[in-house]
From Swiss-Prot:
Protein name: Chaperone protein DnaK
One of the GO biological process terms: chaperone cofactor-dependent protein refolding
Biased composition (Low complexity): 603-618
Source organism: Shewanella oneidensis (strain ATCC 700550 / JCM 31522 / CIP 106686 / LMG 19005 / NCIMB 14063 / MR-1)
Gene3D superfamilies attached to this UniProt entry: 1.20.1270.10, 3.30.420.40, Actin, Chain A, domain 4, Substrate Binding Domain Of DNAk, Chain A, domain 1
Length: 639
């Protein structure tokens, strides 16, 4: 059985880890980095992922996708999506089913399809390290992701060619990474996870006893649309406003300028975590009739903190709710762990310290802990890690819509999973022959205020007065937090069930088609790689041949020289095209035309070899007459 890898599919950065010699190891990608920007770009002939995609974003803003995780499993009309529609340089559109999709070069794409490109890179990184094919993974999601978002993440894995063995919550993964080596005792840990696009707080009890470890999530809460991207956007808007005040031009209307502004804002934010002031200097940011314009703005740490103060305060309310749900007070928390790149901001650390009354731990890498935890969970599933039990929870309550548009809960939030629950309902009208089971997720009493996960009908109910038929509804949540629902007429035994699969917005057929497309692209990518290889070999041969022609000088007959130059010209022309066979044919023709050059080079080598041999003999004869001399080493202090 191959290795199961652990992947942190992040909003801003992603990371992959594997168990290596019993320890979780974070892997370096092809660029030599341990984290990969979650950025995907589409050009005329290829898909670019990670740092290379980030580098070209300024010149290709409309087809470069970042923070795609904020759209995964969401509806286009959601308030959070509408906010992003107005600030993202790329196009966010409504799919036929009402989901939020993106568009690039006329192609409409589902967020899981785009996210799959990042997962493919993580998969390839692991395969390069392990030297074998990888087909299974544990993928992390924010603890507060709903059923749709979890299912969409699983779909992304399938499209990338991975069987997702488990979906694990990010704070839980971080707690695994922190607690796996801890000795005896019972610890209650608060994991504050402020990433690029999402915020989670989880209260986790770690019980270590005689080599056995139990990680039990007591409560979780959060906001799936609050993270570092929002901090960046505050700074971007501030810079755009300052420029407008000074120059009278609105950079928000220029996608290229906004992409440069985004890069600069992100860089400035990072710098202000270690310095009190920085300068954003962007020459030639735009131009008008009077000429080019430059943006130069000084930003202090205090200014940045004032811009994002309300965002930091927004993270504190979920902390209070999670503690209340776990029936704990601040004094019950033994350790605080910070996860996610945005927690490097001193003001965030200060807010967390003030809330919990203790310093967060500094020995957990906020960028890598989640991937490490995913790799440990992968080890648990494969049997490589023993004596570890992970008890996670469902973050939101689950129920159905009942008479009066009320949500009736069957499973309360923070229930340990996997779990089952059942309840008997009845009809609302006399002689009702069918009931609609409308499945909801959320905490509101009003059904319409919660997230609709799907609905199905149970028909064939025998005519009877209202309230008489007995319809048993069963909810079953698996270890990934994904829901299966069934409804049974207890009198007839007729049953109808639904796995909330299409809640990701993609039908089984659509996912299967995307898997096929991804496989086809893999073949395309392979062909493209082979084409580039042929081009490189051809270029190298032309370069070497030119050098040999120069070195041969007059020794090369003019007729042969003309043939070689014509062959080189043919190679240079072929290299500009996309026909691999034509390039290889032209390359072979050049090799054959250069036969005379090879003869000249060999003759020259033999001549030089003979001369060197004669010189060596002369040198040896002289050496026989040499007498060794005594010597004394002169120390520096004697000089």
């Amino acid at each position: 059985m191959g290795k199961i890898i652990g992947i942190d599919l992040g909003t801003t950065n992603s990371c992959v880890a594997v168990l290596d010699g019993g320890k979780a190891r974070v892997l370096e990608n092809a660029e030599g980095d341990r984290t990969t920007p979650s950025i995907i770009a589409y050009t005329d002939d290829e898909t670019i992922v990670g740092q290379p995609a980030k580098r070209q974003a300024v010149t290709n803003p409309n087809n470069t996708f970042f923070a795609i995780k904020r759209l995964i499993g969401r509806r286009f009309k959601d308030d959070e999506v509408q906010r992003d529609v107005n600030i993202m340089p790329f196009k966010i559109i409504a799919a036929d089913n009402g989901d939020a999709w993106v568009e690039s070069r006329g192609n409409k794409m589902a967020p899981p399809q785009v996210s799959a490109e990042i997962l493919k890179k993580m998969k390839k990184t692991a395969e390069d390290f392990l030297g074998e094919e990888v087909t299974e993974a544990v993928i992390t999601v924010p603890a507060y992701f709903n059923d749709s978002q979890r299912q969409a993440t699983k779909d992304a894995g399938r499209i990338a060619g991975l069987e997702v063995k488990r979906i694990i919550n990010e704070p839980t993964a971080a707690a695994l990474a922190y607690g796996i080596d801890k000795k005896q005792g019972d610890n209650i840990v608060a994991v504050y996870d402020l990433g690029g696009g999402t915020f989670d707080i989880s209260i986790i009890e770690i019980d270590s006893n005689d080599g056995d470890q139990t990680f039990e999530v007591l409560a979780t809460n959060g906001d799936t649309h609050l993270g570092g991207e929002d901090f960046d956007n505050r700074l971007i808007n501030y810079l755009a406003d300052e420029f407008k005040k000074e120059q009278g031009l609105d950079l928000r209307k220029d996608p290229l300028a906004m992409q440069r502004l985004k890069e600069a804002a992100e860089k400035a934010k990072i710098e202000l975590s270690s310095t009190n002031q920085t300068e954003v200097n962007l020459p030639y940011i735009t131009a008008d009739a009077t000429g080019p314009k430059h943006l130069v703005v000084k930003i202090t740490r205090a200014k940045l903190e004032s811009l994002v103060e309300d965002l930091i305060i927004r993270t504190l309310e979920p902390l209070k709710v999670a503690l209340a749900d776990a029936d704990l007070s601040v004094s019950d928390i033994n350790e605080v762990i910070l996860v996610g790149g945005q927690t490097r901001m001193p003001k965030v650390q200060e807010a967390v310290t003030n809330f919990f009354g203790k310093e967060p731990r500094k020995d957990v890498n906020p960028d890598e802990a989640v991937a490490v935890g995913a790799a440990i969970q992968a080890g648990v599933l494969s049997g490589d890690v023993k004596d570890v039990l992970l008890l996670d929870v469902t973050p939101l309550s689950l129920g159905i819509e009942t008479m009066g548009s009320v949500m009736t809960k069957l499973i309360e939030k923070n229930t340990t999973i996997p779990t089952k629950a059942q309840q008997v309902f009845s009809t609302a009208d006399d002689n009702q022959s069918a009931v609609t089971i409308h499945v909801l997720q959320g905490e509101r009493k009003q059904a319409s205020a919660n997230k609709s996960l799907g609905q199905f009908n149970l028909d064939g109910i025998e005519p009877a007065p209202r309230g008489m038929p007995q319809i048993e509804v069963m909810f079953d949540i698996d270890a990934d937090g994904i829901l299966h629902v069934s409804a049974t007429d207890k009198k007839t035994g007729k049953k109808q069930n639904i796995t909330i699969k299409a809640s990701s917005g993609l039908s089984e057929e659509e996912v299967a088609q995307m898997v096929r497309d991804a496989e086809a692209h893999a073949e395309e990518d392979k062909k493209f790689e082979e084409l580039v290889q042929s081009r490189n070999q051809a270029d190298g041969l032309v370069h070497a041949t030119k050098k040999q022609v120069e070195e041969a000088g007059d020794a090369l007959p003019s007729e042969d020289k003309a043939k070689i130059e014509a062959a080189m010209s043919a190679v240079e022309t072929a290299v500009k095209g996309n026909d691999k066979e034509a390039i290889e044919k032209a390359t072979q023709a050049l090799i054959e035309a250069s036969a005379k050059l090879m003869e000249i080079a060999q003759a020259k080598a033999q001549t030089q070899g003979g001369a060197q041999e004669g010189a060596a003999k002369q040198s040896n004869a002289t050496a026989d007459d040499v007498v060794d001399a005594e010597f004394e080493e002169v120390k520096d202090d004697k000089k």
